[in-house]
């Protein structure tokens, strides 16, 4: 019996919607990254994007444990000397609630062209509304 290898044009992708209200950031991000990669499917192939589409709503209600709300820092750099910026989890959550989950999931996916294709299948929205009703996403309990 030969080892099965998925082909990119044969992959069946599902749409799922996840409610992030009162979920822990890291645990949610790990499961989302697993499903974006396609590791939950029996036809998973490392060099093919076999993952599903994930729509996440209510990301402004995400939480972190312990004192990470004040201690966790997000850094970015302008490219100029001394141009480093830092924000805490709370500051980033208040200003750009979607970015917190996007950054967490992106760090858990492979780097390179395949990882970039996987992160494009993640749709993150604050609030309970999303524009993907036409895809009829299934509710995914995490």
Swiss-Prot record:
Pfam families: Ribosomal_L13
Gene3D superfamilies in alphabetical order: Ribosomal protein L13 (3.90.1180.10)
Residues making up the signal peptide according to the UniProt record: none
CDD domains tied to this protein: Ribosomal_L13 (cd00392)
GO BP annotations, alphabetical order: negative regulation of translation; translation
Highest taxon, organism lineage: Bacteria
Key words, A-Z: Ribonucleoprotein, Ribosomal protein
Lipid metabolism is among the record's keywords: no
GO cellular component: cytosolic large ribosomal subunit
InterPro entries from the UniProt entry: Ribosomal_uL13, Ribosomal_uL13_bac-type, Ribosomal_uL13_sf
GO molecular function: mRNA binding; structural constituent of ribosome
Family (UniProt): Belongs to the universal ribosomal protein uL13 family.
Function: This protein is one of the early assembly proteins of the 50S ribosomal subunit, although it is not seen to bind rRNA by itself. It is important during the early stages of 50S assembly.
UniProt subunit comment: Part of the 50S ribosomal subunit.
Protein name, as recorded: Large ribosomal subunit protein uL13
């Amino acid at each position: 019996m030969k080892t099965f290898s998925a082909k990119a044009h044969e992959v069946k992708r599902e749409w799922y919607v996840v409610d992030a209200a009162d979920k822990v950031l890291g645990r949610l991000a790990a499961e989302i990254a697993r499903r974006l990669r396609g590791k939950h499917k029996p036809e998973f192939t490392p060099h093919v994007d076999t993952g599903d589409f994930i729509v996440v709503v209510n990301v402004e209600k995400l939480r972190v444990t312990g004192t990470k709300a004040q201690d966790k820092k997000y850094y970015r750099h302008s490219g100029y000397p001394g141009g480093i910026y830092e924000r805490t989890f709370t500051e980033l959550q208040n200003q750009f609630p979607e970015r917190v989950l996007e950054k967490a999931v992106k760090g858990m996916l492979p780097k390179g062209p395949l990882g970039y294709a996987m992160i494009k299948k993640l749709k993150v929205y604050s609030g309970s509304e999303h524009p993907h009703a036409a895809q009829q996403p299934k509710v995914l309990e995490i």
